[in-house]
A protein has these predicted regions:
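N-terminal propeptides
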Residues: 1-172
Length: 172
């Protein structure tokens, strides 16, 4: 459901020093500028980010923050996400707007991606109640857990939710 253009460097080299030849097409394609089919002018960043310059880290686990970035990026929403850089990520719970307790754990440049992923219901926030010893009523709390590893089952749910957003745009 998250269409990605195929890409290989035309000079025959690889942009990454840690991938094998059999993985080069996939890694180069998902990290290339303009990777998302939704990026009609091929100017946006890839749908996955390298872990550092020239390093993809193919054996590294994927975290919730990575998934939020990738799925929002695959929908072609980079400019909207970038416009939210540095803002406090918030969620709505029964009409109450709650700022995430773990905002400081979300890199400033990725907060817009998390905000959009939450707004589009691609990925969920975690909710809980907190009550001090003298508080008459509990307070609703929310967090994102950006560094939590995503299981295959979690990934399947998020991919399915992303498909719904993809098809909405096709009907316009």
């Amino acid at each position: 459901s998250q269409a990605v253009r195929q890409f290989l460097p035309t000079n025959g080299t690889s942009n990454f020093t840690d991938i094998s030849a059999d993985k080069q097409l996939l890694v180069e394609s998902i990290t290339a500028k303009g990777a998302a089919i939704r990026d009609r002018f091929q100017v946006l960043k890839g749908v996955m980010l390298p872990t550092s310059a020239g390093i993809f880290s193919p054996e590294e686990s994927v975290k919730r923050i990575d998934v939020a970035y990738s799925f929002v990026q695959s929908l072609g929403l980079q400019l909207k996400a970038d416009s939210l850089t540095g803002t406090q990520v918030k969620v709505n719970f029964n009409g109450q707007v709650i700022t995430l307790d773990d905002n400081n754990e979300i890199p400033s440049n990725l907060r817009g991606y998390v905000q959009l992923a939450l707004n589009l219901n691609l990925i969920n926030a975690y909710f809980g109640l907190a009550q001090g010893p003298y508080d008459l009523t509990p307070t609703m709390k929310a967090s994102f857990k950006p560094d939590q590893i995503v299981s295959r089952g979690d990934f399947a749910v998020i991919a399915t939710r992303t498909f719904n957003e993809w098809t909405k745009a096709l009907g316009k």
